[in-house]
Design a protein with these regions (language model features):
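Long, contiguous binding/interaction regions
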Residues: 1-69, 75-98
Length: 98
């Protein structure tokens, strides 16, 4: 997939197209995030994005303890729902979205 660092809307447009072509909706979608400093406040903010959704979550701390990997499998309705969640998470400073 192409990366758009200067224009997020172009990135999301491309992501939507790829999701519509390659993913069956409604269904589960796998999100992966990395917290850069294992900040409990940021982790709480991430959980709040998924509060009203059906999801399962796993976490794994890096070997040096500096990072926390968070994997969330979430039931989504369509590609717009996937993108809305990504946009909500993007507002949390210090979280890397994979």
């Amino acid at each position: 997939m192409e990366q758009y660092t200067t224009n997020p809307e172009e990135f999301y447009k491309s992501l939507k197209k790829n999701l519509d072509l390659n993913h069956d909706f409604p269904g589960n979608y796998l999100y992966k995030f990395i917290l850069t400093n294992h900040d409990e406040e940021k982790l709480g903010e991430l959980y709040q994005v998924f509060d009203d959704l059906e999801y399962s979550l796993t976490t794994k701390e890096s070997s040096n303890g500096k990072y926390l990997s968070v994997t969330i499998s979430c039931f989504v309705l369509d590609s717009n729902h996937v993108i809305k969640i990504y946009k909500d998470v993007s507002k949390i400073e210090g979280i890397i979205m994979l």
